[in-house]
Amino acid sequence: MKPTTISQLRRLKETGKKFATITAYDFSFAKLFEEEGIGVMLVGDSLGMTVQGHDSTLPVTVDDIAYHTRAVRRGAPHCLLLADLPFMAYATPEQAFENSAAVMRAGANMVKIEGGQWLADTVRMLTERAVPVCGHLGLTPQSVNIFGGYKVQGRDEAAAQTLLNDALALEAAGAQLLVLECVPVALAQRITNALSIPVIGIGAGNVTDGQILVMHDAFGITGGHIPKFAKNFLAEAGDMRAAVRQYIAEVESGAYPGEEHSFH
């Protein structure tokens, strides 16, 4: 198996072919995901909730991310591996560079950071120093205390325009990918069409170039509130490997996410 690259994802965008990605936190699931055809994985700070049992992502540290990144890389040596920089790990460009180095030494190919055009200088600095960056806009969980909860973003025109401007600014600064979370389908379409870099959606309809799900949502083992955009593929498929294959197939065909998983 050849490694998945950002160039391959760009070609998929150019040819209109969708791709599936998923969060991974350990060796065994990462190995399963790669064996069943997932080429892009994220060691997300969502591990604070799904693995550590916190009520938000805020307690997660760089050391936590690095630990899980090493485990995932051992299980999936060929995947394009993204790693979140957690809360307050990129408050300054210098801090972002130091912490990016830590997670890349652990095996990440790219770091993901949450925020808009105010991060352009950080993205530019990291890119110039050979650290590929994935942006993250819309509902950014590290900002949950600012948003007042987990809410759909960009529903009015002013907010939508701000998100579009943020996306363009991140791309201009050198971002290689963009995650777009919990935004109306029409806005996701505008942003996906406006950018030359691949856009990965979660709660953004089936109009983005790729999709990502938290693995616990895909297997129906999330405790507490289940997001509208989540689908339990395990319930339909019957076993984990078949569930992963079904997830990939439905993303590639555009069947998932459906209208019932989308916001307007």
Curated annotation (Swiss-Prot):
InterPro entries: Pantoate_hydroxy_MeTrfase (IPR003700), Pyrv/PenolPyrv_kinase-like_dom (IPR015813), Pyrv_kinase-like_dom_sf (IPR040442)
Main location class: cytoplasm
Organism placement in taxonomy: Bacteria, Pseudomonadati, Pseudomonadota, Gammaproteobacteria, Enterobacterales
Domain of life: Bacteria
Pfam (any one): Pantoate_transf
Keywords from the UniProt entry: Cytoplasm, Magnesium, Metal-binding, Pantothenate biosynthesis, Transferase
Name listed for the protein in its UniProt record: 3-methyl-2-oxobutanoate hydroxymethyltransferase
Oligomeric form and interacting partners: Homodecamer; pentamer of dimers.
Species per Swiss-Prot/TrEMBL record: Cronobacter sakazakii (strain ATCC BAA-894)
Residues annotated to bind 3-methyl-2-oxobutanoate: D45, S46, D84, K112
Record pathway: Cofactor biosynthesis; (R)-pantothenate biosynthesis; (R)-pantoate from 3-methyl-2-oxobutanoate: step 1/2
Cofactor(s) essential for the protein: Mg(2+)
Keyword flag Endoplasmic reticulum: no
Active site: E181 (proton acceptor)
Entry's Gene Ontology BP terms: pantothenate biosynthetic process
Function according to Swiss-Prot or TrEMBL: Catalyzes the reversible reaction in which hydroxymethyl group from 5,10-methylenetetrahydrofolate is transferred onto alpha-ketoisovalerate to form ketopantoate.
